[in-house]
């Protein structure tokens, strides 16, 4: 029941809004791009990114637990993010600076959303487990957020 998890609803709504914006921008780019030659390779890359973003909507199932919805959204968003890596690299290689900027901007949007989802899933899982077993301490969600975010921060420090 999503009504019990306003932070999850907020994260998923933010993601949906972001992906809608991405689809609109990618479609606009696709419409103003002529077919053929070098442009055809870009069209394929754009179409791939569009497909990932559009496919996200099909993965949200209202009958699932909220934690599963977040997990599925995280997975789809990670796929979209790696697609933007590929689109950005393709655009750079083909000297399509406007598309490179679009891909990098969209990737930046998604990194924020992935972070939001990764924090939210911990508190939602803890709450769902508490619903199933009242002996579970729901504050472990906040502990999990701190530890998992620290793990990501450690990865960033070493790269």
Predicted regions: what they are:
Residues 24, 28-71, 133-144:
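Carboxylate-rich helix-loop segments that flank metal/cofactor sites and access channels
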């Amino acid at each position: 029941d999503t009504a019990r998890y306003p932070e999850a609803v907020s994260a998923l709504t933010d993601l949906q809004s972001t992906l809608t914006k991405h689809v609109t921008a990618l479609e606009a780019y696709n419409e103003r791009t002529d077919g053929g030659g070098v442009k055809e390779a870009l069209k394929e890359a754009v179409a791939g990114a569009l497909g990932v973003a559009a496919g996200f909507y099909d993965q949200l199932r209202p009958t699932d637990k909220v934690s599963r919805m977040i997990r599925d959204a995280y997975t789809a968003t990670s796929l979209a993010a790696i697609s933007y890596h590929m689109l950005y690299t393709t655009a750079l290689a083909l000297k399509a600076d406007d598309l490179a900027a679009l891909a990098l901007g969209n990737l930046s949007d998604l990194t924020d959303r992935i972070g939001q989802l990764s924090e939210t899933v911990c508190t939602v899982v803890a709450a769902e487990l508490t619903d199933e077993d009242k002996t579970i301490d729901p504050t472990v969600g906040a502990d999990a957020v701190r530890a998992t975010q620290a793990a990501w921060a450690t990865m960033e420090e070493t790269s």
